[in-house]
């Protein structure tokens, strides 16, 4: 029903609760970028997209109200879309997303990109427009990404890769806890190492698995420096690449022509991610999700929405791969915060 509604632009349909849902603004993927977006670097260049093509990618930030409405589903704890903030956790009745399914969020926000005989879905948070300048921060765009990940169920051999902001900016929300593995790219410089140390310090209490990819490592001295400063967290290093340079010049080559040493580095990254599957802790993901929701609710969300957003927490709901796991009083058991127990 929802896929059909998306394909027929402009048509209105109702969900099971009788609410009328409309396609998000700009759902036509052929629409031109708005505001100042065309003046900013376009995403997708690393996948071989031409700048003009990349500039037409649909932005999740623009479609945030629609994303909220879809994910909200029939969750009785969420009174309206206006009551949802970027950290609102899923609960009974919420719609969950899967990597390999067709759903309205993917239909509206993902562009399929051909990759040497296969393809991948590419989504972008969205760039600043002229209307945003001076009055909004980029975290308002990233909120759509955080909601997406909070409602995502991914399984073995499924990958969602997020290119995050650099360094400490990642800690402006709970987004940094949404990953099985975080790869931090660091150059062999004091500044590169300091970003790593800062990130590791901020993440130390949240069980974040962190590995470092040494970038622009061209000399033995570069490798020795990173090993001395980073130690066992240094996973792989990459140096100069003619393949990458050609892509940056707008002449992308097939992925099969990537240098052997760089292909080996990427393979090692994938194996590192695959190894985390056995250690996946859905209860910890849910606990941290609720933890940051309560922090945001108390610091600004309650005042912004005029509601007690702690009441959105479903005390029996724990996210898991089946999408159906419920533990009676699960969050009361998992969370050691009195505010949560009182709210739910």
Question: Which residue ranges define each predicted feature?
Answer:
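Conserved catalytic-core segment of NTP-binding enzymes
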Residues: 135-256
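N-terminal phosphate/diphosphate-binding loop that engages ATP/GTP or pyrophosphate donors
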Residues: 24-118
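Phosphate-binding/switch loop-helix module in NTP-utilizing enzymes
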Residues: 84-168
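Conserved lysine of the Walker
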Residues: 14
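Walker A (P-loop) phosphate-binding loop of P-loop NTPases
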Residues: 10-11
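C-terminal lobe/tail of nucleotide-utilizing enzymes
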Residues: 205-344
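Hydrophobic anchor at the beta1->P-loop junction of P-loop NTPases
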Residues: 6
């Amino acid at each position: 029903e929802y896929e059909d509604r998306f394909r027929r632009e402009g048509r209105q349909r109702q969900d099971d609760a009788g609410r009328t849902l409309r396609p998000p603004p700009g759902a036509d993927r052929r629409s031109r970028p708005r505001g100042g977006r065309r003046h900013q670097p376009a995403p997708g260049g690393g996948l071989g997209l031409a700048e003009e093509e990349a500039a037409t990618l649909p932005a999740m930030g623009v479609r945030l109200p629609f994303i909220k409405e879809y994910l909200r589903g029939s969750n009785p704890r969420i009174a309206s879309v206006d009551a949802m903030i970027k950290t609102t956790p899923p609960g009974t009745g919420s719609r969950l997303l899967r990597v390999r399914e067709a759903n309205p969020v993917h239909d509206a926000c993902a562009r399929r990109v051909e990759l040497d005989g296969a393809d991948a879905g590419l989504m972008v948070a969205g760039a600043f427009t002229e209307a945003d300048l001076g009055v909004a921060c980029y975290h308002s765009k990233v909120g759509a990404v955080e909601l997406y990940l909070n409602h995502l169920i991914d399984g073995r051999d499924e990958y969602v890769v997020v290119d995050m902001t650099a360094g400490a900016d990642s800690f402006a929300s709970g987004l940094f806890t949404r990953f099985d593995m975080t790869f931090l790219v660091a150059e062999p410089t004091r500044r590169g190492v300091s970003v790593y140390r800062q990130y590791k310090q901020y993440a130390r209490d949240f069980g974040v698995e962190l590995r470092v990819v040494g970038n622009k490592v061209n000399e033995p001295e570069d490798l020795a420096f990173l090993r001395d400063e980073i130690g066992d967290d240094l996973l792989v290093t990459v140096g100069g690449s003619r393949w990458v340079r050609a892509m940056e010049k707008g002449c992308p080559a097939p992925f099969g022509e990537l240098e052997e040493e760089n292909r080996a580095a990427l393979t090692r990254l994938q194996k590192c991610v695959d190894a985390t599957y056995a250690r996946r802790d859905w209860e910890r993901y849910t606990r941290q999700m609720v933890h940051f929701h309560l922090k945001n609710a108390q610091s600004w969300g309650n005042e912004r929405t005029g509601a007690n957003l702690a009441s959105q927490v479903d005390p029996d709901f724990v996210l898991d791969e089946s999408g159906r796991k419920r533990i009676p009083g699960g969050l009361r058991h998992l969370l050691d915060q009195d505010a949560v127990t009182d709210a739910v």
